[in-house]
């Protein structure tokens, strides 16, 4: 397999460093404002935006690109904190339905203004409208290409020999 071209390598490292810096800043803000990890905040934010403020565990795992076991652990922590509830889906006994509680909605509302400020400051303020349009188009194509692969929540585990 051929090595990456220098411009590909530069782009890859710039992307990874930018994502890492943004993720670190967002993680710090979410912890300071809401005493949650970024993954926990993502789960609550997705539930807050979902129809009827609920999703199945599988939909949550696919939406946040997180393993089933990791999601089960995070959901347990959020449920213990009173931020979500979990119940068997009335439509499919095999599915677990996750619903955000009033306390969960309040926590998202407390975190969101600072979260928006961090994202705007670090990601969007340095970009022109044209830059934003170009970046959005590129990242949308890359995301769609990656999402065309089977979601991790349905991937089978590889057995060790």
Predicted regions mapped to residue ranges:
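Short, hydrophobic-biased segments on the C-terminal half of alpha helices
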Residues: 57, 75-76
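Charged, amphipathic alpha-helical coiled-coil/dimerization segments
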Residues: 76-134
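Alpha-helical linker/hinge and terminal dimerization helices associated
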Residues: 22, 26-29, 64, 107-126, ...
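C-terminal regulatory/oligomerization modules of transcriptional regulators
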Residues: 1-4, 129-161
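N-terminal helix-turn-helix DNA-binding core of bacterial DNA-binding proteins
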Residues: 24-69, 154
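N-terminal leader segment of winged-helix/HTH proteins
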Residues: 1-34, 81
């Amino acid at each position: 397999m051929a090595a990456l071209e220098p411009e590909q390598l530069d782009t890859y490292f710039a992307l990874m460093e930018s994502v890492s810096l943004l993720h670190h800043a967002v993680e710090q803000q979410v912890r300071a404002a809401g005493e949650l990890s970024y993954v926990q905040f993502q789960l609550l934010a997705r539930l807050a935006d979902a129809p009827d403020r609920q999703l199945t565990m599988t939909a949550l795992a696919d939406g946040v690109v997180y393993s089933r076991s990791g999601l089960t652990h995070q959901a347990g922590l959020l449920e213990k904190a009173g931020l979500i509830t979990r119940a068997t889906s009335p439509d499919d006994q095999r599915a677990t339905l996750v619903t955000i509680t009033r306390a969960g909605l309040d926590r998202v509302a407390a975190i969101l203004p600072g979260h928006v400020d961090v994202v705007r400051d670090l990601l969007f303020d340095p970009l022109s409208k044209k830059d934003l349009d170009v970046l959005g188009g590129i990242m949308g194509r890359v995301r769609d290409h990656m999402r065309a692969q089977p979601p991790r929540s349905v991937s089978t585990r590889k057995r060790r020999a």
